[in-house]
Amino acid sequence: MKAFYGILIIFILISMIHLSQQVFINATCTLTSQCRPKCLEAIGRPNSKCINRKCKCYP
């Protein structure tokens, strides 16, 4: 059972590090497809979402 909790803590820490790599750029949007070219230009990858009318880029 101790191993399970250890693995769970490691998983949570890795998830937190991964989520902290998200980048909000100062670009307005209404659809996620509008963010793709902007994120490609900003960080070099088209992985993105439109959240609260702001583009969020993922590495």
Curated annotation (Swiss-Prot):
Has the structural arrangement of an alpha-helix connected to a beta-sheet by disulfide bonds (CSalpha/beta). Pfam families: Toxin_2 (PF00451). This is Putative potassium channel toxin Ts24. Expressed by the venom gland. The record marks 58 as: Aromatic residue of the functional dyad. Residues 1-22 form the signal peptide. Disulfide bonds join 29-50, 35-55, 39-57. Potently blocks Kv1.1/KCNA1 (85%), Kv1.2/KCNA2 (91%), Kv1.3/KCNA3 (89%), Kv1.6/KCNA6 (94%), and Shaker (97%). The lineage of its organism: Eukaryota, Metazoa, Ecdysozoa, Arthropoda, Chelicerata. It comes from Tityus serrulatus (Brazilian scorpion). Belongs to the short scorpion toxin superfamily. Potassium channel inhibitor family. Alpha-KTx 04 subfamily. It is found in: Secreted. Its main location: secreted.
